[in-house]
């Protein structure tokens, strides 16, 4: 009877020696497989792409595009992408505009910074303000010059922004179109990438427009809103008003006719004259000591000679309460300790100012 082991080990046996066990010969066969070597070499070349020079990369790209297996490779990549990449069909076609950006655009258009150049910013001025004298004309001219400067800077920066955005977008689109020759990139994906780039750049546009709006608001506050505030009177106007006040100290309430005459001589409005006298009476009460010195100064001027600004008040020789030490009860008919300023013509104390020599309009 034949030995079973000898039968299995013979060349005519059913199973070869070392069946199912790894051998060095088998490993060597795998290593010597040309296809495995090609794949490994390709992977190594892919890893070394970042180290290549531009000329080397262009040469290899040309070689790949001319390779006879290039269409097959592209078809395989398309098949893989169909299975793995999310579909863009359900993505939103276009996002709604940013409401904050729309508000900034509307403000810039209203102020004449954006859109066609116009007088913008000064349109809300009333005709009375525009004809309010040489000072107003100079102020409005200065405002328009500053606004034109802001407009120029804004358009220069906006042009730089649009140029940078356009250049970067064009560069990315060209890059994606070039890559689409090797890997599948649809026009829809390129359009989506352009939208992403524009959203990134919109933050720069937002900052530019916000800074411009802030500059316009500061300019409005400085030049246009200033006309509602107090302005320095000329030295001549201060002399006229002070002389009338101290020469009528017994009753420093000019009539409407006197106010009109004072306004004409000083080149100011009747309302400014009224406010000046109200503030002057308050300052006189609060600074009675300093007012005494100022009154003596104007009395000396009147004694030296009649002033061309005189409104025909009491005679220069008439004694006034300011010519002697101030009594407990002042010459205007009210107690210094009382809260009222005048029983006949009350004045809103909220408009008063504490500084003595600051002759300003409201």
Swiss-Prot record:
Residues 123-225 are annotated as: PBC-B. Keywords: Developmental protein, DNA-binding, Homeobox, Nucleus, Transcription, Transcription regulation. GO terms for molecular function: cis-regulatory region sequence-specific DNA binding; DNA binding; DNA-binding transcription factor activity; DNA-binding transcription factor activity, RNA polymerase II-specific. Residues 305-362 are annotated as: Disordered. The keyword DNA-binding applies. SMART domains: HOX. GO terms for cellular component: nucleus; transcription regulator complex. Signal peptide: none annotated. It is found in: Nucleus. Residues 226-288 bind DNA. Residues 34-225 form the PBC domain. It comes from the Eukaryota. GO terms for biological process: anatomical structure formation involved in morphogenesis; animal organ morphogenesis; embryonic organ development; eye development; neuron development; peripheral nervous system development; regulation of transcription by RNA polymerase II. Residues 41-120 are annotated as: PBC-A. Transcription factor which acts with the selector homeodomain proteins altering the regulation of downstream target genes such as wingless (wg), teashirt (tsh) and decapentaplegic (dpp), thus affecting segmental identity. Belongs to the TALE/PBX homeobox family. This is Homeobox protein extradenticle. It comes from Anopheles gambiae (African malaria mosquito). The lineage of its organism: Eukaryota, Metazoa, Ecdysozoa, Arthropoda, Hexapoda.
